[in-house]
Amino acid sequence: MKNKLLMTMAVIMFCVVAAFGQRTLTILHTNDTHSCVMPLSSVLADTLQAGRGGFLRRIAMLREERAADPDLLLFDSGDFSQGSSYYTLFKGDVEVGLMNQMGYAAGTIGNHEFDFGLENMARVFSHLNFPIVCSNYVFTEYNLQHIVKPYVILKHKGLKIGVFALSPKLAGLVDQRNYGNTQYVDPVATAQKMADLLHKEKCDLVICLSHLGWEEKGMGDQEMISHTRGIDLVLGGHSHTYFQTLRYVENLDGNPIPVDQNGKSGIFIGKLTLQLDKK
């Protein structure tokens, strides 16, 4: 895929212990696409970005990937909003309409999803055809407490896949008028609570969609992972970091937990192939 204007990360394979016989699972992952509806300018000085990105290329690439593997799962780690006049003019309708064509299994909330306030966020999320998950925000307005899910369990290819999500502290990052009475809950405590719950639900794989960021001061993916156990994979975002290969962070038990992140603007889509082995 490297010869395409929309590039996909090299396939990365790693093993997770599952409750059944061996399964192969393909995961595709986007983050911080930031309303990149059209390709970036072809005259950008950065040749890695020039002419790349855009929803049509992403949709075409996904069509090819699904032709090869109809059972793949696609996730988004937030900040699909803000970054072009499409978002400014239509307040998320364009992005949501296009994402609905892509067949996401789940996505989470980035800080820019708040840019037009809670009422607009609730309106936009209610039009999505996939679940929006966030485990560490407590909503009390505009029915968001019912629209946003703390976790989802996907039954897929004979597996139970638990998905929860973490988003960043809002104070100092988002205008308070835009997040209203939304409460931020500690990501470490939330992550452990969710991992424990999903294991009690007999999930074979626990995935965290994270918009905490990589190497962020205070609370990022490294801090969260190193203080928790029971998470198998972190699909990251927020810091716009591009990983050519997976990064690993040791959890509380000293086990290396893989983390993926794919820059910004949808130039890259992460592709991971998991081999889930029998216990």
PLM segments and residue spans:
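Acidic, metal/ion-coordinating pockets
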Residues: 21-279
